[in-house]
Design a protein with these regions (language model features):
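Helix-loop junctions and terminal segments of transmembrane helices
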Residues: 60-78, 242, 246-285, 338-343
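Hydrophobic transmembrane helix module of multi-pass membrane transport proteins
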Residues: 89-213
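Membrane-proximal transmembrane or re-entrant/amphipathic helices at the cytosolic face
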Residues: 1-4, 419-450
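Interfacial transmembrane-helix starts/ends
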Residues: 12, 49, 75-93, 273-290, ...
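Short runs within selected transmembrane alpha-helices of multi-pass transporters and secretion channels
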Residues: 25-29, 33, 51-71, 116-135, ...
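Alpha-helical transmembrane segments of polytopic membrane transporters and translocases
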Residues: 30-34, 45-62, 223-224, 237-254, ...
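Interfacial segments at transmembrane-helix termini and the short loops linking adjacent helices
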Residues: 42, 104-120, 298-335
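Transmembrane helical elements of multi-pass membrane transporters/channels
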Residues: 13-25, 29, 150, 170-186, ...
Length: 450
């Protein structure tokens, strides 16, 4: 009894810490997004959004091959050699890369945008790494403090600089550098030891996980990246604002669960309870479908009027918003399933599935965007992540229940623009019934294995 109570307290503490960190992100977004969208024209806001997106790619390219393997082999607070190795590797790679990126913009008159990309990327990488360290060492409140520090510094800096008419890209870069300072302040002390250390993980694992993460991010942002050459700047700003809204709402909710659960599921797997871990992951996928369905239904019932009160008129397009909500849910399902391949050390499956989904999905997104503008970009993103999730299910031994729920959900959202509001809500309700049925079946499996 005492053991179960201790475990429950650990879960509660972790969930509370992550919740506080996510709420801080939402509050920051509630401050930042309306200010920027009201102060800036859609064209100006689009330039800031694109700088942030490219900065994310900088972070992925320079840091993910180190951060993701560290997440699988984190060591502990008592054994910090892996942390020391990862810290040194990141410094050696990221700092020279940032200098090269900034200098690369000089010949083309693009120093400002390149500074924004490099600064934002450094901030995201540093903040993500330190937060990951604390999370995997089961120190959730240190994790929360790290994220809140980074989020707060980035938000305050970018809003303050934009309000005093600093160039948007420069503001983005300065905000990223401010969060680097915060990450360094809250970082654990490095372990003493030899300056040279053998890599704790294989090169193939790091590269495979990094390529999978890069492909995932490309699918997330590809629509925003190609829209400037296909539609007007106003539509680019609309799409960027809706994408950020989805990321900071349903994306934040799903991210909370993902963040809390992964370290504990990895611990459960390492203890030898592999079947139970797989069943939990399957259940998470179905619950994600339910969250997506209820989110779509809630937006349909409320309409765009409430959202326009926050953003101002002309930012929200309902079919686009619904497709982006569904794409976020599908992407999280794929991420959950990828945990199986990470835990089994089959990282090549993540690489292959993600790259194939990205190739096919990006081609679909281009074609759909050419035909339907921002609606096509959102639908292409949904198709990309649906394919990503289905490919990840191969060789995962998770069964068909999450697949059934996912396909029902995607079908309902995809046919939405062809139906009137009432018919679409009825179909969405039917998808909820299907997902609930699969959820109950999987829950019985979890209960039996426990």
């Amino acid at each position: 009894m005492a053991r179960h109570r201790k475990a429950a307290n650990g879960w509660f503490s972790a969930a509370a810490a992550v919740f506080v960190a996510r709420i801080t992100s939402l509050v920051a977004a509630a401050v930042q997004l309306p200010i920027l969208t009201r102060v800036l024209e859609p064209e100006e806001y689009a330039s800031i959004a694109i700088a942030m997106v490219l900065g994310t790619y900088f972070s992925l390219f320079g840091a993910e091959a180190t951060i993701l393997p560290f997440q699988r082999f984190p060591g502990s607070q008592a054994e910090r050699t892996n942390y020391r190795f990862a810290s040194q590797r990141l410094a050696v790679v990221l700092l020279p890369l940032a200098v090269v990126v900034c200098l690369g913009g000089l010949p083309f008159g693009g120093f400002e945008i390149m500074f924004g990309v490099a600064g934002w990327g450094l901030g995201i990488a540093a903040n993500r790494f330190i937060a990951t360290v604390w999370l995997m060492w089961e120190s959730p409140w240190s994790y929360a403090a790290s994220l809140m520090m980074g989020t707060g510094l980035r938000t305050i800096t970018v809003v303050a600089l934009v309000l005093i008419d600093v160039n948007g890209a420069i503001a983005v870069g300065a905000a990223g550098l401010a969060s680097v300072v915060g990450a360094v302040v809250l970082a654990p002390r490095l372990a003493s030891g030899s300056a040279k250390q053998k890599s704790p993980w294989g090169l193939v694992m790091g590269v495979s996980l990094a390529l999978g993460s890069l492909a995932f991010t490309i699918m997330s942002n590809f629509g925003l990246l190609i829209l400037p050459v296909m539609v007007g700047p106003d539509q680019v700003g609309q799409y960027a604002a809706m994408a950020q809204l989805v990321t900071l709402s349903i994306g934040a909710v799903l991210g909370l669960g993902s963040t809390v659960l992964y370290p504990r599921l990895q611990k459960l797997w390492n203890s030898g309870r592999e079947d139970l871990t797989r069943s939990f992951i399957s259940l998470l996928g179905i619950v994600t479908v339910l969250i997506g369905c209820f989110s779509v239904l809630a937006v349909q019932l409320s309409g765009v009027e409430i959202l326009n009160l926050v953003f101002g008129n002309d930012y929200v397009v309902l079919p686009v918003l619904l497709s982006l909500i569904a794409a976020t849910a599908a992407s999280q399902i794929g991420q959950f399933v990828s945990w199986v391949h990470t835990l089994t050390l089959q990282s090549h499956r993540i690489r292959r599935s993600a790259l194939l989904a990205t190739l096919i999905g990006c081609l679909l997104t281009i074609l759909l965007t050419m035909a339907y503008g921002i609606g096509g970009a959102a639908t292409g993103t949904l198709m990309s992540f649906s394919l990503y999730g289905l490919l990840m299910f191969r060789a995962s031994a998770l069964g068909r229940r999450p697949v059934i729920a996912l396909l029902a959900f995607v079908l309902v959202v995809a046919v939405g623009p062809l139906l009137n509001s009432t018919a679409h809500m009825i179909l969405c309700s039917l998808a909820i019934v299907v997902a609930l049925d699969q959820c109950l079946r999987e829950w019985r499996t979890v209960a039996r294995l426990r």
